[in-house]
């Protein structure tokens, strides 16, 4: 059952998002996973651009089954249900970077904050991770029914607990810039940019924006495979299949699929 404070927060959020072409808002004080709830909503027929968010998420997850830690009130978990249009079906693998671009553009448009996207889709601020993204698919038999876009954004101080041995140290927008962003303001700015950028998906303009946002471009990085072996190379860009383009020390051009390697700074 929702508490009064939860009802008030949901009302405030709906007011903040009024006028946006979204399919509805679901807010929780505490939830296991916004993506898991997104699956349930999608299975029940929730419309395109339905938004799920919470004050606290207790069972969040990231790519490669990694645990995503959400500190209550400081990190904002959110899921958006996407019902892809016919022309978007061939570009489903681009919705994850689209989400990263929407985060980047929201920070820039709303607060003048410049961030980068670490291939394939983490958002970095001062080379520290402030947003992670997990895009999942709901299948009905062999038919794709909907996309579940999940993201966790570290907004306020305390959102990134100190964890040893992280490849990319986590941080928050407030810690890196001193700027305090309210949850309703953040959600509105993000959704505005997601709506604005969505028609660009798969177009030359989409790839241009992604390249412009790419972290470590023209820099030497370490590319680590799942088995632990690694090599170095210079990041050159992204091809039309979403692959990372790298030149190795021998001068050979190599491309890598998302999930095939992990990118780490030297």
Residue ranges and their predicted role:
Residues 1-109, 253:
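N-terminal lobe of the biotin/lipoate ligase/transferase fold
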Residues 1-6, 21, 85-90, 94-115, ...:
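Long, positively charged amphipathic alpha-helical accessory segments at protein N-termini or as interdomain linkers
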């Amino acid at each position: 059952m929702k508490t009064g404070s939860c009802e008030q927060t949901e009302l405030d959020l709906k007011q903040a998002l009024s006028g946006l072409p979204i399919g509805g808002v679901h807010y929780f004080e505490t939830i296991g996973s916004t993506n898991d709830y997104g699956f349930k909503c999608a299975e029940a027929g929730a419309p395109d651009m339905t938004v799920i968010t919470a004050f606290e998420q207790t069972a969040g997850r990231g790519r490669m089954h990694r645990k995503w830690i959400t500190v209550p009130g400081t990190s904002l978990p959110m899921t958006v249900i996407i019902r892809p249009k016919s022309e978007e079906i061939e570009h489903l693998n681009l919705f994850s970077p689209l989400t990263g671009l929407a985060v980047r553009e929201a920070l820039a448009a709303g607060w003048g904050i410049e961030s980068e996207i670490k291939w394939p889709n983490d958002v970095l601020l001062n080379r520290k991770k402030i947003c992670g993204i997990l895009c999942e698919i709901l299948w009905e038999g062999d038919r794709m029914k909907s996309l579940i876009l999940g993201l966790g954004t570290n907004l306020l101080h305390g959102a990134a607990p100190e964890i040893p041995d992280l490849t990319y140290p986590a941080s928050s927008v407030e810690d890196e810039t001193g700027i305090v962003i309210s949850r309703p303001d953040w959600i509105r700015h993000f959704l505005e940019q997601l709506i604005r950028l969505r028609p660009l998906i798969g177009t030359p303009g989409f790839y241009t924006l992604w390249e412009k946002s790419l972290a470590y471009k023209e820099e030497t990085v370490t590319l680590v495979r799942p088995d632990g072996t690694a090599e170095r190379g210079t990041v050159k860009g992204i091809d039309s299949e979403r692959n990372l383009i790298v030149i190795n020390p021998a001068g050979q051009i190599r491309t890598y699929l998302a999930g095939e390697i992990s990118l780490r700074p030297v």
